[in-house]
From Swiss-Prot:
Source species, domain of life: Bacteria
GO biological-process terms attached to the record: translation
UniProt keyword annotations, A-Z: Ribonucleoprotein, Ribosomal protein, RNA-binding, rRNA-binding, tRNA-binding
InterPro entries tied to this protein: Ribosomal_uL5 (IPR002132), Ribosomal_uL5_bac-type (IPR020930), Ribosomal_uL5_C (IPR031309), Ribosomal_uL5_CS (IPR020929), Ribosomal_uL5_dom_sf (IPR022803), Ribosomal_uL5_N (IPR031310)
Subunit structure: Part of the 50S ribosomal subunit; part of the 5S rRNA/L5/L18/L25 subcomplex. Contacts the 5S rRNA and the P site tRNA. Forms a bridge to the 30S subunit in the 70S ribosome.
Source organism (scientific name): Pseudomonas fluorescens (strain Pf0-1)
Protein name as annotated: Large ribosomal subunit protein uL5
GO MF entry, a single one: tRNA binding
GO CC list: ribonucleoprotein complex; ribosome
Pfam families, sorted: Ribosomal_L5 (PF00281), Ribosomal_L5_C (PF00673)
Residue stretches spanning the membrane: none
Gene behind this protein: rplE
Coiled coil: none
Protein function: This is one of the proteins that bind and probably mediate the attachment of the 5S RNA into the large ribosomal subunit, where it forms part of the central protuberance. In the 70S ribosome it contacts protein S13 of the 30S subunit (bridge B1b), connecting the 2 subunits; this bridge is implicated in subunit movement. Contacts the P site tRNA; the 5S rRNA and some of its associated proteins might help stabilize positioning of ribosome-bound tRNAs.
Amino acid sequence: MARLKEIYRKEIAPKLKEELKLSNVMEVPRVTKITLNMGLGEAIGDKKVIEHAVADLEKITGQKVVVTYARKSIAGFKVREGWPIGVKVTLRRERMYEFLDRLLSISLPRVRDFRGLNAKSFDGRGNYSMGVKEQIIFPEIDYDKIDALRGLDITLTTTAKNDDEGRALLRAFKFPFRN
């Protein structure tokens, strides 16, 4: 079992049950999935960009990546319907907890000038989104083998009913919020 999942079951869930005054342990908010998305506007001119992004995201997550395609043609962005414009991957269960553990203990401390995560990046329903400016903060990516620095979006979907419950859950996981 993943280290963070065990910590959640034995320490975090009982603590949150008391803190949020819930009657049943199944009511305690939990992380259901983590979605990583890489929007690749530069892929319009060069199809190799998608291949490199797929390889990077597969190394980071250890899971097959899905290529996302444009839904509509937009002349201003020089995009046609059906063209590949991004890659994404959804992590659940064990892989999700293992990724979260690596993110908190290894990757975030490697970010340059890191002052903490913004505590206001919740969506109103307890889900948290954050952006990473460069993929080299992950230990799986070899700096010498990348073609370009690319950012990615990380979204944590939780069962929390509101932002306060979601914030309490992520604070219990020791997320380094700055405010």
